[in-house]
Amino acid sequence: MAKRTDIKKIMVIGSGPIVIGQAAEFDYAGTQACLALKEEGYQVVLVNSNPATIMTDKEVADKVYIEPLTLAFVSRILRKERPDALLPTLGGQTGLNMAMELSKAGILQELGVELLGTTLSAIDQAEDRDLFKQLMKELGEPIPESEIVTTVEAAIGFANAIGYPVIVRPAFTLGGTGGGICSNEEVLRDIVENGLKLSPVTQCLIERSIAGFKEIEYEVMRDAADNALVVCSMENFDPVGIHTGDSIVFAPTQTLSDVENQLLRDASLRIIRALKIEGGCNVQLALDPNSFSYYVIEVNPRVSRSSALASKATGYPIAKIAAKIAVGLRLDDMLNPVTGTTYAMFEPALDYVVAKLPRFPFDKFERGERRLGTQMKATGEVMAIGRRIEECLLKACRSLEIGVHHNELKGLDTISDHELVAHIVRAQDDRLFYLSEALRRGYSIEELAGLTKIDLFFLDKLRHIVELEQDLIKKPVDIDLLIEAKRYGFSDQKIAELWQTDAASIRRLRRAYRVLPVYKMVDTCAAEFDSQTPYFYSTYEWENESIKSEKESVIVLGSGPIRIGQGVEFDYATVHSVKAIQAAGYEAIIMNSNPETVSTDFSISDKLYFEPLTFEEVMNVIELEQPKGVILQFGGQTAINLAEQLTKAGVPILGTQLEDLDCAEDRELFEKALKELGIPQPPGKTATNEAEALEAARAIGFPVLVRPSYVLGGRAMEIVENENDLRSYMKTAVKASPEHPVLIDSYILGKECEVDAISDGQSVLIPGIMEHIERAGVHSGDSMAVYPPQHLSKQVQDKIVDYTKRLAIGLNCIGMMNIQFVIQNEQVYVIEVNPRASRTVPFLSKVTNIPMAQVATKLILGQTLKDLGYQDGLYPESSLVHIKAPVFSFAKLAKVDSLLGPEMKSTGEVMGSDLTLEKALYKAFEASYLHMPEYGTIVFTIADDHKSEALILARRFSAIGYQIMATEGTAAFFADQGLDSQLVGKIGDNAHDIPALLRKGQIQAIINTVGTKRVTDKDGQMIRSSAIEQGVPLFTALDTAVAMLRVLESRTFSIEAI
């Protein structure tokens, strides 16, 4: 069947901001799909609200709209563009839900827009719990006994009938939002009440819990001619009961017999055929370990997180093929782009094992609820490839970047057996490390299998790692054993610890005996056919398949797993840097460990090494490739942290050099440089212990801002008001980086702004100045940023430009640099300088039309700004107003306080652009799911420091028709000032406290601030978490509330009596 000629223009819906459960995998899928459709000659219109993505680059689609993904905006774009068809299956749950909304509102029918890939009935059958149940019955596929409920009472009735535990799954939600396992009525009542609110159709499925079964996934493809195949099978290390996004996953499946594999494979193919999906689909099944009985858990009728993993694990480009199937091409028409000779109808065969480990945000949120269940909590993931399970598991552990280089966590050897077992029984994000510790203490794998229901096969692999550790201790400097340990994935560092030496000596020993890794190709066909892909992984075997090319090469280090503080923005910069390296005539080589991203798509670079970003692994690749140099600027803190070791090893670092990186990161050197350059900064000192810290704070005067040096995303940063708080900070937080001292600065409450600059060493281009809406003290990644600035005087802007130039030249910056300023009484202070690409690069590149990472790379490779046609200084401003707004994932993270402060908490971002500030703000709020109606009730619960400021806000809210409610102290203050408000009980005042009113839907927004003391007030935290659970807009910074007020005021007419 040929591709369709009756459609010319296709609209693709992106997945919006990155939240837990929906991360960079959709940027990868969307980019692949848009390029595939363009390749086939279609006109592509893309809509997405997330500027930090490659898919929203102008080259990816014919027309790109960065607008809110709401019914109002998407239907306007549809009316304007009049596409023939809509492809919603590449935008995750957001894309599917948008297609459903457009269809239900009658817009698709009115405009004659056809849905491609998955029909509405298939989306309904897979997503609507009732229809799914019916379809499975018709197919004779077993599913756990279940009932759809729309009330809490019905849920309790059904649970009593089948017995606890039961699982709750709300319909049409993402990443298991609102779901959970309930072992009694009390828990069930809470979860269902919340789940019904979160489900857009007010439905929950209550089903028998099959926790403890093996969880298996199949990634399947089908075309319009009913050809179907399995691209990849995957097995979760953790049994059913833990969300697959939070599970350790191996591909292909490891513990299934041939019969079991065929059974589940056939079921998956039957399901995709019954749903008539044209494209990709993910089927999750539960297998009873003791019999051949299985259950179908769920079906995702779209490209998903697992498809990104399956694509990278096999090399088979699922999203690209799915997009082509959607326009009528068949699997047996399309060549497999990996081999270039076999067809896409060919099922991939793997001669290696892949491990995926989730990356959790609990290094940032130490107080968060770490227990795992059916609701996803990981922000990102890493993947590692090896010939053996032990090898890929240990490589994946090193890739996580949580300070471990082995399946071993510092400090676990000192905990009691009781505590150890408690951690193993209750699955947490770090259970793998507790299991490994138990095996080191001599627990048997049978005991652990009994406690966890994890298959003995996997536990035996962990035991084998422990046995190798013991052998290494017994036989120091045994070369045969060294080879054995390397084959099973041990790092030089771990072997060095066991042999009581250092990693450098192990490296020398390995090289002396020629114990070196070889690189194998990922080729989809287990080396049966010749392959064209330059996609490699390391292993300790004989034949090396990665041949150094004749061309001079440059290696770019990626940024590893997505976590809070280091998101998809850095991947964006990496991909752009590669484009510039290729344009300059070099071979571009990427090293990265994240399966979700565009940078690890093998068609992006000339060579891709899927490896942990550690010194050992990076050096191995450098020794093989002998590149011109390595670029670290675009890999976030991950890459910058390797600068020192690489420089010492004699590796040429391209761009800003180590001593200049140090000058920006090392406190004393930085102060000295600023003095020499005549640039003011807030008074500050360094301290290495509690006594020094107290002395420093007394000299500077409270409040002070304290933080460790060399960190990203404001990790462990706090505003401290008094000596007691400082003592407790020094006790708990300084473990963040022991070799580096703690920085103590005077905290200046002023306006914050930031600049990204690009320098060639002689002249400096400043694409734009971004002004933050929230005042200093809120992390820049959590602030709304406005470009061009709206409230900075010409004099202040000139000063910012002058200081930026002085810093870039003074610190010998070649490439990118990010500087943050605070402004108080027209005085400009520098708060920090990062000599690398920052998270604002994609946003600024989009709004100024300067491909910043590409320009920076060209300068790093020796060109000048003048060569590229750019002037020195500030680039002319755009005529539109653009806003970058943060998006948070608090709804997924129980017990994490949503109060904004100097530690970053947002997971993603959106952009709003329009002719006026108010319109741009409106779009940014809509895109970040902060919708406020034009009237309603708003609650004020305000700290003493902010009451007079809040009074002005309350009066303005009242003037546009909002009813004002306030807690006791705030209401009393308002009354004294002549403003009436309705008193509301804080917590525990039964039917009239804030959580109760929130549950009844009687509150439309809450403004809750905490004084500079930032005392952890239990009440405030409960109010904040209730607002998040109920999806009610919550403002913890008055400046954000003022911004929202501007929007509401601009939308309402004033009514005054004459």
Swiss-Prot record:
<dbReference type="InterPro" id="IPR006275">
    <property type="entry name" value="CarbamoylP_synth_lsu"/>
</dbReference>
<feature type="binding site">
    <location>
        <position position="832"/>
    </location>
    <ligand>
        <name>ATP 2</name>
    </ligand>
</feature>
<comment type="pathway">
    <text>Amino-acid biosynthesis; L-arginine biosynthesis; carbamoyl phosphate from bicarbonate: step 1/1.</text>
</comment>
<dbReference type="GO" id="GO:0005737">
    <property type="term" value="C:cytoplasm"/>
</dbReference>
<feature type="binding site">
    <location>
        <position position="298"/>
    </location>
    <ligand>
        <name>Mg(2+) 1</name>
    </ligand>
</feature>
<feature type="binding site">
    <location>
        <position position="707"/>
    </location>
    <ligand>
        <name>ATP 2</name>
    </ligand>
</feature>
<protein>
    <recommendedName>
        <fullName>Carbamoyl phosphate synthase large chain</fullName>
        <ecNumber>6.3.4.16</ecNumber>
        <ecNumber>6.3.5.5</ecNumber>
    </recommendedName>
</protein>
<feature type="binding site">
    <location>
        <position position="778"/>
    </location>
    <ligand>
        <name>ATP 2</name>
    </ligand>
</feature>
<dbReference type="GO" id="GO:0044205">
    <property type="term" value="P:'de novo' UMP biosynthetic process"/>
</dbReference>
<keyword id="KW-0677">Repeat</keyword>
<feature type="region of interest" description="Oligomerization domain">
    <location>
        <begin position="402"/>
        <end position="546"/>
    </location>
</feature>
<feature type="binding site">
    <location>
        <position position="820"/>
    </location>
    <ligand>
        <name>Mn(2+) 3</name>
    </ligand>
</feature>
<comment type="subunit">
    <text>Composed of two chains; the small (or glutamine) chain promotes the hydrolysis of glutamine to ammonia, which is used by the large (or ammonia) chain to synthesize carbamoyl phosphate. Tetramer of heterodimers (alpha,beta)4.</text>
</comment>
<comment type="pathway">
    <text>Pyrimidine metabolism; UMP biosynthesis via de novo pathway; (S)-dihydroorotate from bicarbonate: step 1/3.</text>
</comment>
<feature type="binding site">
    <location>
        <position position="284"/>
    </location>
    <ligand>
        <name>Mn(2+) 1</name>
    </ligand>
</feature>
<feature type="binding site">
    <location>
        <position position="169"/>
    </location>
    <ligand>
        <name>ATP 1</name>
    </ligand>
</feature>
<dbReference type="GO" id="GO:0006526">
    <property type="term" value="P:L-arginine biosynthetic process"/>
</dbReference>
<feature type="binding site">
    <location>
        <position position="300"/>
    </location>
    <ligand>
        <name>Mg(2+) 2</name>
    </ligand>
</feature>
<feature type="binding site">
    <location>
        <position position="242"/>
    </location>
    <ligand>
        <name>ATP 1</name>
    </ligand>
</feature>
<dbReference type="InterPro" id="IPR013815">
    <property type="entry name" value="ATP_grasp_subdomain_1"/>
</dbReference>
<feature type="binding site">
    <location>
        <position position="752"/>
    </location>
    <ligand>
        <name>ATP 2</name>
    </ligand>
</feature>
<dbReference type="InterPro" id="IPR016185">
    <property type="entry name" value="PreATP-grasp_dom_sf"/>
</dbReference>
<feature type="binding site">
    <location>
        <position position="779"/>
    </location>
    <ligand>
        <name>ATP 2</name>
    </ligand>
</feature>
<comment type="function">
    <text>Large subunit of the glutamine-dependent carbamoyl phosphate synthetase (CPSase). CPSase catalyzes the formation of carbamoyl phosphate from the ammonia moiety of glutamine, carbonate, and phosphate donated by ATP, constituting the first step of 2 biosynthetic pathways, one leading to arginine and/or urea and the other to pyrimidine nucleotides.</text>
</comment>
<keyword id="KW-0436">Ligase</keyword>
<feature type="binding site">
    <location>
        <position position="298"/>
    </location>
    <ligand>
        <name>ATP 1</name>
    </ligand>
</feature>
<feature type="region of interest" description="Allosteric domain">
    <location>
        <begin position="930"/>
        <end position="1058"/>
    </location>
</feature>
<feature type="binding site">
    <location>
        <position position="834"/>
    </location>
    <ligand>
        <name>Mg(2+) 4</name>
    </ligand>
</feature>
<feature type="binding site">
    <location>
        <position position="300"/>
    </location>
    <ligand>
        <name>Mn(2+) 2</name>
    </ligand>
</feature>
<keyword id="KW-0665">Pyrimidine biosynthesis</keyword>
<feature type="domain" description="ATP-grasp 2">
    <location>
        <begin position="671"/>
        <end position="861"/>
    </location>
</feature>
<feature type="binding site">
    <location>
        <position position="241"/>
    </location>
    <ligand>
        <name>ATP 1</name>
    </ligand>
</feature>
<feature type="binding site">
    <location>
        <position position="832"/>
    </location>
    <ligand>
        <name>Mg(2+) 4</name>
    </ligand>
</feature>
<dbReference type="GO" id="GO:0006541">
    <property type="term" value="P:glutamine metabolic process"/>
</dbReference>
<feature type="binding site">
    <location>
        <position position="208"/>
    </location>
    <ligand>
        <name>ATP 1</name>
    </ligand>
</feature>
<feature type="binding site">
    <location>
        <position position="832"/>
    </location>
    <ligand>
        <name>Mn(2+) 3</name>
    </ligand>
</feature>
<feature type="binding site">
    <location>
        <position position="210"/>
    </location>
    <ligand>
        <name>ATP 1</name>
    </ligand>
</feature>
<feature type="binding site">
    <location>
        <position position="284"/>
    </location>
    <ligand>
        <name>ATP 1</name>
    </ligand>
</feature>
<dbReference type="Pfam" id="PF02142">
    <property type="entry name" value="MGS"/>
</dbReference>
<dbReference type="GO" id="GO:0004088">
    <property type="term" value="F:carbamoyl-phosphate synthase (glutamine-hydrolyzing) activity"/>
</dbReference>
<keyword id="KW-0460">Magnesium</keyword>
<dbReference type="GO" id="GO:0046872">
    <property type="term" value="F:metal ion binding"/>
</dbReference>
